[in-house]
Amino acid sequence: MMPPLVLGAQTGEDILDMCAAPGGKTTQIAALTQSQAHLTACEMNIPRAEKLEANLHRQGAKNVPVMRIDARELDEFFRFDRILLDAPCTGTGTVISGNEKSLRGLTEQLLGKCARSQRALLDRAMGALKPGGTLVYSTCSILPQENEDALQEALDKHMDCELIPLDGTPSESETRRAQEAGEEPRVECNALTEAIAAGHVSSVANGMPGTLTIPPSRDFEGFYIALIRKRS
């Protein structure tokens, strides 16, 4: 799965998977860090938290505490080097074209509920980052209300956080640094930017350059992903 690869977690770091059940991305982070990071998973739904714990055990992910709380109410005490927020959403990226049954549950009420929750989760996630820490925000939706609109609102509130582009362009702070130093700006690369450059993944334009909307295809369900860093 792409979000844990973009997160780029390292051994020894404090890492949070905010909406972790059923645990596929959590176990991937544990594997990528060889269980040598301080990884915490969060899930407020008790049956889903129990399934998460069972999956972590089954996959051999060691020393991953599961907090059975609403991540929107995460204590101010907590601070993390990296946070993965794969937020609950309408799932429009998984809708099958022409399949009316797959559209049946998509209502304005559901969209509004998801959008409110996503904004609260983003607000808490940005607040819980350490200086220099990074956040991956992803959904399996392709609707702007759940993606770039929600993210822009959070960035407007958290002025100490900035977008790290995933489209092969430098960030604003890197552009300024390079200009002051008389250098070419550096572009941060990860598995997703490399896959796009190689033509393995296609994205479509959205309302926030630097974030990616991946449309549904034979190879992928549709999803949205963005990378944010809190300035040091």
Predicted regions and their residues:
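S-adenosylmethionine
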Residues: M1-S232
